[in-house]
Amino acid sequence: MRHHSLTKRAQMLGATGIALAATLLLTSCGTNAADAEHDKLKVVATTTQLTDFATQVGGDDTEVTGLLPAGGSAHHFDPTPADLLALGQADVLVVNGANLESFVDSAVEASGFSGVIITAADGIDLAEAKQITAEGEDEASGTAAAADAVAHDHDHDHADEHDHDHGDEANHDHAEHADEVASETANDHDGHDHGDTNPHLWTAPRYAEGMVSEIADGFAQADPEHAANYTKRGEEYIATLTELDRWAAEQFAAVPEADRVLVSGHDSLRYFLHDYEIGFAGAILPSFEDNAEPSAAQIDALVEQIHARGVKAIFVESSMSPKLAKTIAREANVTVVDDTALYADSLGSAGSGAESYVGATVHNTRAIIEAWGGSVTDPPAAVDAAMEG
């Protein structure tokens, strides 16, 4: 920082001169403070989870701006002019990768961003993630097969497959979806291609650890002066995530295997379910995206799976409307958990208890297990401390 000495000049000046010198000194201090703020690494992160990770790693050495708000979803996000302005001024952009953020390329071009892009997904084993995705699709294949069977029945029962109303509309609120193609896959809905890997990598704490490590490494390369700080904070936060993972595993292991079956809002919790050995009976929206539309046949097949696998509750996600979940729960005669929504695509707003990644994961663990009729123990001190973000 620059220090300006005004001692000799002040001695030569009268009261007016001294006042002027004092003003110059204060102006200099103000400029120095602004310079210090300007010296911070300017970071823009796409999702709320990545914004939290970047904040945890960056600490006082960064100025982090998140593009998505609490409750926002990367599946249908459109940057505002303010978002583009922040991006254009940033030194670093942190993205998820795995084809989650379709808006990034156009946003980078429109904003004129010319900094460093850190792809958090590069910190994990994507080959393993692809395999876990495939295993999840195999597990849910019973739902897809049932949907095809239902669709086949519809073809026989209705001469015009585009006009059928799927029975009594009063008893089937989802009739409006009946003209959807039952065999529609999760990866080609609306022309979006997510590849072979479910992009919701952060839902497993051990994958979050790899993403945080990638962010810490990226910050260190972009800002070598503070590299040691980024490394230290990253290691400390990863240690907390390790404790979080261990705690969650212990909670789910205490639940009988037959009860560990879940229906989610959309296919967003694949890695969470895999790591904690939770069965997947299907999703309300059978897609990686949360703005897809299920067919009537897919809904009927999901209801059949709920009955067949003894699902106790259907969960609503914070970024989704509970309307369809309530319809399915009513048809399946099970509970819909909409008062304690799960946080998958987005973290919660301030005061929700899920405004941090750690807090959201603890919340999801507790909400799921309690809906199954179980209970959880208090998380470790380090995890509890990190829940406030």
Q: What kind of region is each of these model predictions?
A:
Residues 2-20, 25-389:
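Extracytoplasmic metal-acquisition and chelation regions
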